[in-house]
Design a protein with these regions (language model features):
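C-terminal structured "cap/appendage" subdomains that terminate the fold
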Residues: 130-200
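An acidic, gly/pro-interrupted, aromatic-rich
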Residues: 1-137, 186-217
Length: 217
């Protein structure tokens, strides 16, 4: 590990994008939200309101720790599959599938930027970044949590500039700030600087949406 932290000296196979379930689990685990309970009934995490009405059914979203269970416990309706996981090529389960199709579409990036699960995970990471003595250490640690890799100097410089730019914007636009910090059930500490948390969350979201996070190499 000391000689090859990035695992570049030993080839282990071709690059492969993580499945939708893995990407969601990684976001929850990295932010510390993941509920590790094993077994039990299916759960109903965040999904767009009214999606089940097409079949005259009602989707009652769960609350608390149930929102953060592993993706394998997400309730599955074959006629209306969970949109977040389906966007990342999860099969419909109406027929047997030997191998998943793997696509790369703009919708996948939009999911990672706008789905409440990922915004909430980014916001929690943004809150945790406040505990570090400086932004460099906060961003480097968050990058490591999400990607399992050591951040490069040029990557760190880009994210530092992004954090500074977003912080300035959030300080001037409190409504935009509230849009970030109020997404999801996890509560913000009342003493936290909401503009700083939101700016940190944008950085975490950017890392979460990067190829290095969602692709295994």
């Amino acid at each position: 590990l000391e000689k090859d932290k990035e695992n570049r000296l030993l080839a282990r196979g071709p690059s492969k994008r993580l499945t939708g379930e893995m990407i969601r689990n990684n976001a929850l685990e990295s932010s510390g939200l993941l509920n590790r309970t094993i077994g039990g009934e299916s759960v109903k995490p965040y999904q767009p309101e009214g999606l089940w009405r097409v079949n005259n059914a009602t989707y009652e979203q769960d609350t608390g720790d149930k929102l953060y269970r592993r993706s394998m416990y997400t309730i599955w309706k074959r006629s209306v599959p969970h949109p977040t996981i389906a966007t990342f090529d999860a099969p419909s389960r109406s027929v047997c599938t030997i191998r998943r199709q793997e696509t790369n579409t703009p919708l996948q990036a939009l999911v990672l930027m706008n789905d409440p699960t990922y915004i909430e995970a980014a916001r929690v990471l943004g809150m945790k970044m406040l505990a570090f003595p400086n932004q460099k250490e906060a961003i480097a640690t968050t990058f490591r949590l999400l990607t399992g890799k050591v951040i490069l100097p040029r990557e760190l410089d880009i994210l530092l500039a992004l954090q500074k730019e977003e912080h300035n914007k959030f300080q001037k636009n409190i409504d935009k700030t509230k849009g970030w910090i109020n997404t999801g059930e996890f509560k913000l500490n009342s003493s936290d600087d909401i503009a700083l948390v939101a700016a940190n969350a944008v950085v975490a979201s950017t890392i979460m949406n990067s190829d290095v996070t969602i692709t295994k190499r």
